[in-house]
Every structure is written in structure tokens, then in C-alpha cells.
């Protein structure tokens, strides 16, 4: 199932655009490592609180900036990253708590990128390569697993979106599509969409099932 695609952005990105897909050879995001890794390279006295927005924008001397969470990595938008974690998953009281929540954002962002290309497979979307998988220096950007080889949420997001048979939601138009990246045609497979309320109870009137065929290396729309 899917619930990513950066739906919090206005418009939802990357689903909110209809151009610029093609074969992207270099794309990446800010990516917080796990707390276990961060404590290896950020001194304990600097753990908390995180740098202010003003520091992230202008201060070149923080230890965070030296590891690309600050003005040195302006193109990774550290202020927006911090804001997204806080707004989507709640304010944190410690670095450890923030790191745990950041992994959820890491997963959603990278899963959303791959799902956007899935959604337009062979329609101005032929491939996506991440920059990059692994940093040569302890860092807060461009990685799926960190300097210490610990996977971040970005790794698991990419793995989920790139599974051979995948079902996903488009945040821009609410369509549900089945993605088949295998070399085998699939006949009469079942797509099921389940809606839950805020108490975790299934809303049966809103749930749907559809049987469909999906050609090899292609996509099929299940619901809109």
C-alpha cells in the first residue's frame, strides 16, 4: 500500500507536475541518519535543540552545517525538512525522537519519487537514478544508507516503491494504480483499497475491490 507522494506539498510533488520526468540521472533529498549514527559525529552538547531557522539559513559555523544540515546544503532545504518532520509527525523533545520521526519522512519522500515515475511509466518517465546511495562523509543529505552503513528510511522507501509488484496512490488525483515491473503478464489480480477512520476502524462503505490484468513492465489503473 502507499501513503506518501509528498501530499503535504502544494501542489503535491512530484505528482503535481506533468513534465520534466524522462530519465532522471541525478535526484536526491535531505536525509537524516538514525540517532545511533548521528551520535557518532555530532558532539553531545550540540544534540538539542536543533539549529534555529536563522542558523540553518545563515550560520556557517555550526557543527550541523559542517555535515550539510545548514547553508552548505541550501539546495536540500534544511528549514523545510525540519518543518515537514514537525508538522507531519509532531514536535519533538529530543534529538532521538526527531531522528525517529525523520525516518518516516525519509521513507515517504523517496518512495514518493519512485512512485511518481511508476505512475507515468513510459509516458515521459523511463527511469530514475538517485544521487546518491552512500556518502563519503557523515552527512544529512543524499543517502539511502549512511556513512556507517546504517539504512535510513530512504532505503526502505526506495525498496518498497521498487518492489516487482506494487500498488500505489496518486496524491494529485487520488487514483490507485497497480505497477508490474516483472517480465510476466499478470491476469486477474486483485487490487483492494481499504479506508480507515482515525480510530483505526475500517470504513467498509469506502473500501473497494477490483480484479484486473496488468501487462509485463507496465501499469494498470484500479480506482480513481
Regions found by a protein language model. Name each.
Residues 1-7:
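Aromatic- and carboxylate-enriched substrate-binding clefts and catalytic-loop regions
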Residues 9-187:
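Substrate-binding clefts and catalytic carboxylate motifs of secreted carbohydrate-active enzymes
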Amino acid at each position: 500500500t502507499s501513503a506518501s507522494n509528498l501530499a503535504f506539498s502544494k501542489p503535491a510533488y512530484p505528482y503535481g507536475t506533468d513534465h520534466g520526468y524522462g530519465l532522471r540521472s541525478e535526484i536526491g533529498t535531505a536525509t537524516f541518519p538514525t540517532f545511533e549514527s548521528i551520535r557518532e559525529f555530532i558532539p553531545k552538547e550540540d544534540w538539542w535543540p536543533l539549529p534555529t531557522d536563522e542558523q540553518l539559513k545563515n550560520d556557517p559555523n555550526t557543527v550541523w552545517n559542517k555535515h550539510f544540515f545548514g547553508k552548505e546544503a541550501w539546495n536540500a532545504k534544511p528549514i523545510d525538512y525540519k518543518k515537514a518532520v514537525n508538522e507531519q509527525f509532531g514536535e519533538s523533545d529530543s534529538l532521538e525522537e526527531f531522528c525517529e520521526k525523520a525516518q518516516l519522512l525519509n521513507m515517504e519522500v523517496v518512495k514518493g519519487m519512485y512512485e511518481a515515475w511508476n505512475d507515468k511509466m513510459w509516458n515521459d518517465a523511463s527511469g530514475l537514478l538517485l544521487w546518491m546511495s552512500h556518502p563519503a562523509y557523515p552527512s544529512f543529505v543524499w543517502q539511502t544508507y549512511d556513512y556507517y552503513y546504517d539504512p535510513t528510511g530512504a532505503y526502505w522507501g526506495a525498496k518498497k516503491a521498487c518492489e516487482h509488484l506494487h500498488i500505489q496512490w496518486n496524491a494529485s488525483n487520488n487514483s490507485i494504480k497497480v505497477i508490474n515491473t516483472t517480465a510476466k503478464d499478470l491476469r486477474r489480480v486483485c487490487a483492494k483499497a481499504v479506508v480507515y477512520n482515525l480510530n483505526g476502524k475500517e470504513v467498509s462503505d469506502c473500501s473497494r475491490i477490483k480484479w484486473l490484468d496488468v501487462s509485463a513492465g507496465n501499469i494498470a489503473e484500479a480506482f480513481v
